[in-house]
């Protein structure tokens, strides 16, 4: 079947069930096809019929509608139609229709058909002229109609805003600007970058072969940064080479990104100890929220001015024979994330119950009504205004029940999903990994997904890839390795959303050990109250974790590995598990006994005693998932009692 993208495709306007539809005229289709969303009297056939379409493929059809009324230019036509989901069209006029109402004549801008005689509606039999519509015209009309709808909706929204919504809009306008050093930026703090050895000169020779494109882009970009006061010409003895990168994100933006190699400077300077918040701790904070807003600090780092003594350290070289230094905190310094996170944490101090920042991304979250959420958002905006923090208006997303944040999509029903761009990056890697660096990047991307809890038993699948990263092992890549990478990528294409538990949900963890790997999953038992039925409990998957036992741990007995798997899983989710009782499910009756009976503190069992003491801090109710009737459970319980 031809697609709507074919500029020569023929469409005519028809009316079915009083709804006007752009129907595709397909001389290669055996019979008329309709999308299931068109409400016809569908009848399931005893056996499917096979139809051929224009691309020569054959498909099975199970539902058919007889005597479908199709109105064209106020003339009634009738034809049998079958239901097909994958046609890509609302309605396709096939050969059964064209043969029934022949002669069928097709011109450049029209088609002609013979309308049938219908005495019931006084319709004569006659040839009718039907103008055709091309896909480009359909698209033009659709865009125009959509634009009109959007403009009307914006007009209605603007005139129907509540006083609170208007206040939020006006305050957002006041704190937004495209220039991070606008007069709105009233921050007077000056950032210091200090050398470990103040006498050291950090000067990296620039031996990069620049292209003519590089020279032109550096000239334009640096001139713009000088004009904005972001950089200035320098006579510093320090220098780092600048270059352009064009990775996946840059290709999507259609703009290359300037990068400065501050590797030598980072080795020579004192770091910053302020830590970035962990993603899991962020998710713990926002659990149970049903309204979200995100704000973005405009060119975040650039809102912090450098101390005059620190500016020369940031000097960089680029063509054509230029030497600049930064007036603001540049990207690429090892101290930059910690410095900026500290800046944001101080500015938003006291708002932690409904607001958090991850570097330059701000998330406002509430479990409340929309109005209450907007009230909290207004507090955050007014704080930004007070502190002179400039935001990006085009990146502000206000009062949503589903929102993207840090590579995740947060939903008000408690589910979280990976954003598509994260999986796109993984898909870009070839199956046949070329070298160690590419393998490191692949595993790093995979770890990002695994750390969010989306991958089940991923350690078992990647355990043979990690040794290849080590330079002590000769590089070798086999067809089996390529097959494994392909399998992992396929697995990542179909990741189920995870549930983020509410405070009132009861938590369950399930653990297992197998050979040299361990795995666990976290579930939440959610109590539902469906209308007209009894209350029911539904277990929802929250996240997975897994790992590889160390070489020493791999020598442990099966029972010890099962116990250690439970401990490692509880350590991983300690923050979620410690506050209240939860259930630990295991298929090891040994672990059940381990949790119930105290060990004797003797030198033969020192490791197990330490594990049991650690176990005691968790309010776990251990459940043997194979049931109490398992004879091994009784045997092992007696074994524990004798110790």
Curated annotation (Swiss-Prot):
Residues annotated as the enzyme's active site: 26 (for protease activity)
Annotated Reverse transcriptase domain residues: 226-410
UniProt record, GO biological process: proteolysis
Domain Peptidase A3A, chain residue ranges per copy: 6-209
Domain remarks: The polymerase/reverse transcriptase (RT) and ribonuclease H (RH) domains are structured in five subdomains: finger, palm, thumb, connection and RNase H. Within the palm subdomain, the 'primer grip' region is thought to be involved in the positioning of the primer terminus for accommodating the incoming nucleotide. The RH domain stabilizes the association of RT with primer-template.
Main function: Encodes for at least two polypeptides: protease (PR) and reverse transcriptase (RT). The protease processes the polyprotein in cis. Reverse transcriptase is multifunctional enzyme that converts the viral RNA genome into dsDNA in viral cytoplasmic capsids. This enzyme displays a DNA polymerase activity that can copy either DNA or RNA templates, and a ribonuclease H (RNase H) activity that cleaves the RNA strand of RNA-DNA heteroduplexes in a partially processive 3'- to 5'-endonucleasic mode.
Protein name: Enzymatic polyprotein
Organism: Cestrum yellow leaf curling virus
